[in-house]
Amino acid sequence: MTKIKNYTLNFGPQHPAAHGVLRLVLELDGEVIQRADPHIGLLHRATEKLAETRTWIQNVPYMDRLDYVSMMSNEHAYVLAIEKLLQVDVPLRAQYIRVMFDELTRLLNHLLWIGCHGLDVGAMAVFLYAFRDREDIFDMYEAVSGARMHAAYYRPGGVYRDLPDQMAQYSKSKIRSASAIKRLNENRSGTLLDFIDQFTNGFDANVDEYCNLLTDNRIWKQRLVNIGIVTPERALQLGFTGPMLRGSGIEWDLRKKQPYEVYDRLDFDIPVGVNGDSYDRYLVRMEEMRQSNRIIKQCVAWLKANSGPVMSDNHKVSPPKRVDMKTNMEELIHHFKLFTEGMHVPNGEAYSAVEHPKGEFGIYLISDGANKPYRMKIRAPGFVHLSAMDEMSRGHMLADAVTIIGTQDIVFGEIDR
């Protein structure tokens, strides 16, 4: 008599829907998943160990390369942990700038997520729409830091520099017509804040476009509704955070529950799901984009009305002004020590977490008083979410594995570290 056995399928790490270098070993009964075993580590770069050999400020660019689609949110957790150890006060204007760019980063992340999630499931148009808005946010990154992705803009004590008074404009090009360049430069004649203001005024309408393409689309609903259900109790037991937890109906958001920077001064809502399936998580993230846009508008209004410093005046943490450096020996010494040796952080340990686009992103630092960390531990939200892959996909069809990976919104830079 013939014995029927389950068969094993390797999904990835080269698969286009694997969102990076994910290898899934799937045990299938026909097309039904019986077991899903994620294999990670293919993008491991020893970031935590490298941090022990670099100064505190040299580690900021490494943060950008963890979750490489939510760059400034990673930096934020790191500098908050250092500020806890240093006991330094951050100027209010710098706090508003950080919050504004945190929320722009959330838009950047969620736009890539909806584009790729749609593409994985078979909806190609939304991918093209999403990248239109991402280009504008990359221009904002470039305006403050000179880099379109890996900004390294946040610093312990504030931010690298104030917002520019003039938004950069597109110049003549062989790849664009004169009319296209004129259209691109229409809203770039003012300051960066003017550019962000115009972006936010039109962004809610763009989110409506994405919703019109997907929310009531019957194929989209067939692919997401009742797929990857996680109950509220199980979500807590598994350690879910961010949209994965809120999609299961639990209203937990660090911006509200443990406010940092100026979030307690801002007005916004926390969207939550009901059923805990992939469709609810989609709805939560779409509403999060609207709420982030609302926060950005409030930050822009405050920043336009209020000026001030964007960096701590403690010159053991931040460099002195160039004019002071040329007239004052002590300031010159501070500058020399800061850029050759780096700051010395007092003995101690600190944990700091931010409401990252993917969940709670935490940095745990131990200092032994030296100019570099003694130990750094990164709490990556995607690591926890991917560990639930087996439980979320068991009993679903093979094609649903792609949907579940998409709804988890995983990026291997932070998972493998």
UniProtKB/Swiss-Prot annotation:
Its EC number is 7.1.1.-. Keywords: Cell membrane, Membrane, NAD, Quinone, Translocase, Transport, Ubiquinone. GO terms for cellular component: plasma membrane. It catalyses: a quinone + NADH + 5 H(+)(in) = a quinol + NAD(+) + 4 H(+)(out). InterPro entries: NADH_Q_OxRdtase_suD, NADH_UbQ_OxRdtase_49kDa_CS, NDH1_su_D/H, NiFe-Hase_large. It is found in: Cell membrane. The keyword Cytoplasm does not apply. One of its GO terms (molecular function) is quinone binding. Transmembrane segments: none annotated. It is a peripheral membrane protein. Pfam families: Complex1_49kDa (PF00346). Its main location: membrane. It comes from the Bacteria. NDH-1 is composed of 14 different subunits. Subunits NuoB, C, D, E, F, and G constitute the peripheral sector of the complex. NDH-1 shuttles electrons from NADH, via FMN and iron-sulfur (Fe-S) centers, to quinones in the respiratory chain. The immediate electron acceptor for the enzyme in this species is believed to be ubiquinone. Couples the redox reaction to proton translocation (for every two electrons transferred, four hydrogen ions are translocated across the cytoplasmic membrane), and thus conserves the redox energy in a proton gradient. Belongs to the complex I 49 kDa subunit family. This is NADH-quinone oxidoreductase subunit D. It comes from Polynucleobacter asymbioticus (strain DSM 18221 / CIP 109841 / QLW-P1DMWA-1).
